[in-house]
Amino acid sequence: MFTGGGTIALIERLATSWLTAIRLILSWHPIHAPNRNQEPLDSLCREGREYIVMISGTVHPRHATWPFWQVMRKCLDWCCAFHPPDDHSCEFGAPRIGIRLEGENHFFAPILGLYSVVMTWSPISCYREFPIRQNSKEPDPQPSTSSEPEPQPSTSSHRNIPVARVRPLVAQQKVPKTRPLDTEIHRPGPIAIQNPTDTDEPELRLNPRPRPGPSGQNTRPRTPTLDLDTVVVRDHPVTHRRPRSPSPPEEDYTNQDENLSYTPQLIHSSPDSEVAEEIYAQPDPWGTQELLLANRERTPDDQTDITDDSADWSEGETRRPSHSEVGERRLSRENNSEDPNRSRSRSRSRERRRRRPRVRPGRRSTATTIRDLVVLGMSSSDDE
């Protein structure tokens, strides 16, 4: 069909076999049972969809459409489905399941849309309707705008019964089809491409910039015809995502001192993560990204929360709070819960006591332990 080699008979058989296969699937489903008419429509549609999936996908994942093609082959072998409307020579009667008799059935309207799609890609000629003037036999491409009253239809006597003779108002004209529907209209293009018709430059309006073709070269998109090689194929997949913004430049923020190192956390930390890129591409009306970039430019000397303890623990270990931090948390918690009616001197003395690092009985600090070991070692060496 794409190359124009399909005949009219083959295309009609293909479209009719599809319609017949769908009718068989719908007739097998118990949705048409008389005792199921009172069930809600959403449950029936859900069961019908599951039933069709079960029919079309129970053989093998690579041959999921095998049952459909088997049904289509049976339909192609069934001659009664492809008889013309005025043919009565079939010995099986005249079931007339062909596509030509299904136009008045609104239940199969979505299925009949496939027939229109098949005919669109076929080289079969189309028929366009033109209005006909009452005083002329030739078709008029434009509708008549004259204000003259339409003539009354003439009457004649047939078996003593007056019969009105009315000329047809519409005539059909056969139009050869040179190419299918324009794929540029139905297929959305890449994002962030300016429309040449919206620009103010007359050169771009008359000669728009060439867009990349199927081979990736800067060639103009060719007009799609019945040849498969001339169908325009987009290099970029259709997506609803916003265009990705470039990642910020990577710089080394490690200080010369080995004990102090500052590695800021960025939103765009992993360039391979599409989620991070999507967040980074969002608009920033509150200036959050500028604040993050400003924090990156700060020197480690400006960081007041970096201590020697934070440089000692490695990346894989979890940091344990120091005794001073625990004491400050307890102090702030107790200060908030204190009664304001107490004397200020008593609260100040308690604050001074709480600020001192508390040493539990039986547990000594690391510095004291090392100093004692040094003293004990020196005393033991003197004794020897």
Curated annotation (Swiss-Prot):
Residues 143-157 have a biased composition (Low complexity). Residues 133-257, 297-368 are annotated as: Disordered. InterPro entries: Marek_disease_virus_LORF3. It comes from the Viruses. Residues 302-315 have a biased composition (Acidic residues). Residues 343-363 have a biased composition (Basic residues). Residues 316-342 have a biased composition (Basic and acidic residues). This is Uncharacterized gene 12 protein.
